[in-house]
Amino acid sequence: MALMTWTAAEFGTNVGFADDQHKTIFDMVNKLHDTAATGNRSEIGKQLDALIDYVVMHFKSEETEMQKKGYADFAAHKAEHDKLVGVCADLQKKFHAGEAEVNQDTTRFVRDWLVNHIPKVDKLYGPCLSA
């Protein structure tokens, strides 16, 4: 069963590239959530790395568009991105050093961040970036 499901009503920003990337992130988190239940560290590590790489790329895409369009809340938005990237990088480093686990609690943390960030923060850039 999926940990999270993207719907336009709940998560749509009306910015095509962002919505498409959010859907991919949801799919990747769901896959990592299912794999985390198996305890297969090798596969978990591969999926964790792919997810973090994709999220970093996504954040850069959003930030580039925000700067191009002169989005007023760019600095605060980027600060939220930077904070999550820092948490993820620390987890990634510790996981690969054998000092941390990635389990379903981890994926629920990511879900909770996304289901708060997208509707409350990302949706605010919709009018600016889609103009």
UniProtKB/Swiss-Prot annotation:
It comes from the Bacteria. Fe cation 1 binds at residues 22, 58, 62, 122. Keywords: Iron, Metal-binding, Oxygen transport, Transport. CDD domains: Hemerythrin. It holds the Pfam family Hemerythrin. Fe cation 2 binds at residues 62, 77, 81, 117, 122. InterPro entries: Haemerythrin_Fe_BS, Hemerythrin, Hemerythrin-like, Hemerythrin-like_sf, Hemerythrin_metal-bd. GO terms for molecular function: metal ion binding; oxygen carrier activity. Oxygen-binding protein. May be involved in a storage mechanism or for delivery to oxygen-requiring enzymes. The oxygen-binding site contains two iron atoms. NCBIfam families: bact_hemeryth (NF033749), hemeryth_dom (TIGR02481). Belongs to the hemerythrin family. Monomer. This is Bacteriohemerythrin.
